[in-house]
Every structure is written in C-alpha cells, then in structure tokens.
Amino acid sequence: MASEGMILTNHDHQIRVGVLTVSDSCFRNLAEDRSGINLKDLVQDPSLLGGTISAYKIVPDEIEEIKETLIDWCDEKELNLILTTGGTGFAPRDVTPEATKEVIEREAPGMALAMLMGSLNVTPLGMLSRPVCGIRGKTLIINLPGSKKGSQECFQFILPALPHAIDLLRDAIVKVKEVHDELEDLPSPPPPLSPPPTTSPHKQTEDKGVQCEEEEEEKKDSGVASTEDSSSSHITAAAIAAKIPDSIISRGVQVLPRDTASLSTTPSESPRAQATSRLSTASCPTPKVQSRCSSKENILRASHSAVDITKVARRHRMSPFPLTSMDKAFITVLEMTPVLGTEIINYRDGMGRVLAQDVYAKDNLPPFPASVKDGYAVRAADGPGDRFIIGESQAGEQPTQTVMPGQVMRVTTGAPIPCGADAVVQVEDTELIRESDDGTEELEVRILVQARPGQDIRPIGHDIKRGECVLAKGTHTGPSEVGLLATVGVTEVEVNKFPVVAVMSTGNELLNPEDDVLPGKIRDSNRSTLLATIQAHGYPTINLGIVGDNPDDLLNALNERISRADVIITSGGVSMGGKYYLKQVLDIDLHAQIHFGRVFMKPGLPTTFATLDIDGVRKIIFALPGQSVSAVVTCNLFVVPALRKMQGILDPRPTIIKARLSCDVKLDPRPEYHRCILTWHHQEPHPWAQSTGNQMSSRLMSMRSANGLLMLPPKTEQYVELHKGEVVDVMVIGRL
C-alpha cells in the first residue's frame, strides 16, 4: 500500500480488486456463481478496468461473515476495490447493505445513485435494489446486484469514475493532478435560458426511439452510442452507458439496450467523461457502426414502413456498403453473436446440447466389487486344485454366503464378488470334476491356474468415483454423454438454449413449392433449403413464408416473429434491384445495426449481417442473397457457426480438411467457395475433391450430393488456376 503522499509508479498503479459473492445457494454449491465469475472477467479486461483479482470468495447471507471478509480485505489485504454481488434486494436474508454500512467509514452516495439511475432506465424493478457504496481506509466498497446481468450493468454504470476514485484514495498525486488539470480547462456550461419542458412518462416512452435515432444521426462519426452537446459538459448516465464495449458482447454476455437518450434529458460525451474513463472505442474490435436503440413496444407498434419507394430515379447506382473481406466478416459475425441463456431439460433430450454446469457422480461405479468375466470367485491363496462349489452369484443379486478355504462360487459377468473371495478365474481355466445326478448343478471344479489377488475384479469406484466430475461444463453432448448422464443418475441437466431460427423468402416472383408455375413466377426453393440446413443441425425453426418486395410487408413480417426468434434469416432483396428494400427496412424502420452489406467472396457478394437489440435481448439477422446456391453457401459459412456459438459450443468454427483436386479449377478474382464431393481412395491420406460442375450461383444442381466447399484463393497474375492433384482446403458441409 502506498504511504501518505507517495507518487505512484506505473507498477504501483495496478488496481487490486476483490470480488465477494454473497449467496446462500452458491455457498452450498446448489448454484453456480455466474455473477462473481463474470465480474472477475470484467475487472481483468484491459479494455475496461484492467485490474488484478487479488481475492475472491463466496459467503452465505450472514452479516457477520460478510463483515469479517470485508474488514480482512480492507485492513489486511489492503485491496483498492471490493465488489460485492448479491444480497441487495428486499428478501429477508438480503443483508449485504447492512453489513457494508457497519464496515465503511465514509459513504459514496454518488456511485449508488449512478447505479440506481442506470438501473431504472433498464427496468422499473431497479428501484428494488438497495446498494451501498463507501470507503474504509483506502479501500472502495461497492454493492452490486446478485444477477449476472444486473451486476454487469451496474459495474459499467460506475466504471468511468472508478480509476480516478481509486487514484484519489491512494493519493496518487500525479494522476489526480492530470485529471483535475483537464477538468479545469473545460468551459463552464451556460445557464439554461428556460427550464426544460416536463413530459409525462407516457410521452417519454413514445419519443424514446425517435430521439435516439435523431441523436445518432447527429453523431455519425462516433464509434459509440452517445451524443455531444456543446452546451453541456457534465458526466451523465447516458455517457456512461454509451461506453459499454462490444468486446463484452463477443464473450456471449447478454447485450444491454443502448438507449442512451433515455438515460438523461441532456446526454453528453464530454471531455470530462473521456478523461475519467479508461474505456476506449479504439479498442473495440467491431466495425465502426452506428448503435441503434429499440424497444419491443416501439417496433411492434410500427405497421407502415418509413422507407420512401417513390423516388426510383434517385436510387443508388453503386452499393453504399463497402466490400468486407471474408475473414473480417466471419470474425464480426462471431463477435456480435451472443451466447444464449440456459434451461433445464430431461437427460433424454440432451443430444447435441452444450452443458452449462459440471455433472458430478452421486455414487461409485461399480458400487460393489464386480466380476469382469464368467467364471469362479476364488481365494487367490488357495492356488490351483480341486474346489467345492458353494453356490452362484448372478448380476443383480447380492450373495449371502462367504467363500472359505477350499471353496469357490460360480459368478457371471457383472455379478458381485462374495465375501472371502479376492479373485476370479475364468471358466476357460477350469475343469468340471463333479456334478449333480440330474446335471443341473456343478458340485466340484478343478482350478488350473494360479490366480492373483484382484484378478478380473472391478473394485468399488473403478469406473467412476463418487463426487467425480464425469462431464464438464461446455461439453457438447452425444450418445455417450447421454449414456453417462443415465449412468450417474442425473436425469435433469442445465444446458445452453438452442437458438430459434425464423426463415423467410422475399420476392414478388416467388410461388410456394406446391403451386403451378405461372408466367414470370418461379417456385421458392431457398426457404426449403435453408430450413432443412438449419434443422439438420438440430435447431428449432419457424417458417415465415414468402414476403413480397414491399417495405410494409417486409416490416410487418419481421415484426410478427422477431420476438419469438433469436435469429432471422431472409433470402433475396439485398443486391441492387430497384425493388430491394430489405436493408432499408432494417436500417430505417427497425433501427438495426448493419455490420456489413457486401462480402468479397463468390458466391454471396451481397450477404448482409445485422443485429438488433430489443429490451436488452440481441436478435441476429442474416439477409442472404436470393440466388439459391448463394443462399445455402452463405448459410453454411456464416449462419451455422453463429448458431453453434449461440448454443454455447466452445469452438463454433466449421471443420476444414485437406483434399486433392480431381480436375483443374480456374480461379476467380474473388475468393471462391466451390461445391465439391469428397471421396476417399484406398490407402491415400487425403480425400479427392470432385467438382459438382457448373458453379453458377442460380444452379442448385451444383449443391446436389455436395459435402464440401473448395476454399479457393483469388486469382493473381502468377496463379490463374489450380491443377489436378494439388492439395487445397475444403470446408466440410455434409456427411463424409
């Protein structure tokens, strides 16, 4: 700990943090401490606080235990910051604020107020939180809610002030002076000419979405969802919430609604806020896009699109979306895709799911010494020789007799070993000496070999020991894992939810598959292909049908299902056609963030990816090309990995193998994903990749029987084609 007045060096400036989880259920191992673990990640994130976790503990909801830990961490460990999570509500055992008040020497009410203000703009239930913030010695103590989402939100609300607060407590003279000097250079805001008009809560709700969009338009060059008002230079809840980094989203943390306008009547991103925050938008790994705010109420209320379809002559002649590399597009999709929450399911429904909790064995397996073979339970010390048979031990029965010297007992595979026996001799190493007159019973047997103690016996707990972790969190379950759940008697298990995927085709020219072909019309194959692709991976789907090329129809179709689906896939309406309005509906009507609208690839150039945050829940939107092959190829390249991440699969990337070309292949200026059929020849290490023929993006026949995509590089002056026998990368998309 730095002494009074000491100038801190860079090494001394490391923030030492303790995370204290207050929860009866977590303390008793009845629940996982998600909030505490998440806070540790947030604290250590260099783009956030960049601190060091010096202490972590789980205590029950007991005042004395909470106090004892806080005092120890303040006085003995001399931590700079303590974050508690849990016990701040109205329940009888929620006593964290009371314990904290008995420990702190000075209160920090501004921080508690910032958390309450921010929470109330997320949910009215925020008023039920009772956080206490205060100081003991040179340690700052912050009470956060017990939920993972609530604790993360409140941590982010106070984050901009934390580094400066800790510098003040540590008397870090140089750093404190730097911030104060920057604040002194700021102009004071002029007095208001008139008091701001008061509005009813109802009116504020109605105007929220419009206000946010207008402010976003005024700050187009900003990488964050905040606004800058020249007449205001104070830190607001809006400025704080606007700095939530997208790097958190890439870890699968539930997204917060970036409705920054609703957090303050005069939101600002002032130099003071920048000076007191360690969050930098430059560190954000996502494309610089405008952040939009939406609520379910505002979206569902809209039935008429705001897209202007009258000025056809003024439509874009060139796409306004820059070309995005395939690598960047793929990384963006995974970074913007959240991991879904969890649910409890019956183990019989566990195929293909990802475990959200470790699974432990409740019993030993086997629970008794068991025979490995059919034979005779013997005393190893007796050695070879003739033995009397005293009975039989069968699987499912517990023998009551004890094997004495000169005796053996007949056993079957899996049967319990009787008392007195310490080895099993297989039936092949014996000879029958005597039997009953009717031949129904063995009476005496000759042991032909010397048995070893423990021979052919599975001891108690040999396969699985009681308390052993048999399946780890994050395990992607298959038939064997389902069998293990049954083995250890775990009939209910917590898993990550499956994403629900809604699929829609767009186009005035489309007919349903059962319809007769009419002039100017074609049957819709994209929807069937995409639904089948998603269902083949086990995900639940919603069929949204065909929607015409009309903004109102597109908006209403999306509104109808957007609350029921986690992912929406559309095909068509994303290139340069005069009737293609989908991107405009996403942008203007739904206020979605379009992260990319063109990808440098073949097929699939106009592939579009967008996200929409509604009331704190992120919706993923893939607007795929209308050409049938382009739609299914981009679905495999982008959609399937995103769905795998959403369900919690640790590595959602597709499987890529090496294969030899069966024929010469000409290269395209764009990276190409060429459909092929993989086959193995006898004793060859690599499969052979046979092209499916004409690769025109409208020719669905090129997908027939295809189980791979040749990942061909773009053409260069040196390389215009690849030759038969060359080894290339192939992405596996079907059964091998």
From Swiss-Prot:
Location of the region described as MPT adenylyltransferase in the Swiss-Prot/TrEMBL record: 294-736
Enzyme Commission no: 2.7.7.75, 2.10.1.1
Pathway in which this enzyme or protein is active: Cofactor biosynthesis; molybdopterin biosynthesis
Similarity comment: In the N-terminal section; belongs to the MoaB/Mog family.
PANTHER family hit by this protein: GEPHYRIN (PTHR10192:SF5), MOLYBDOPTERIN BIOSYNTHESIS PROTEIN (PTHR10192)
GO biological process: establishment of synaptic specificity at neuromuscular junction; gamma-aminobutyric acid receptor clustering; glycine receptor clustering; Mo-molybdopterin cofactor biosynthetic process
Lineage: Eukaryota, Metazoa, Chordata, Craniata, Vertebrata
Gene (name only): GPHN
Membrane topology: Lipid-anchor
Compositional bias annotation for Pro residues: 187-199
Protein name stated in the entry: Gephyrin
PROSITE patterns named among the record's database cross-references: MOCF_BIOSYNTHESIS_1
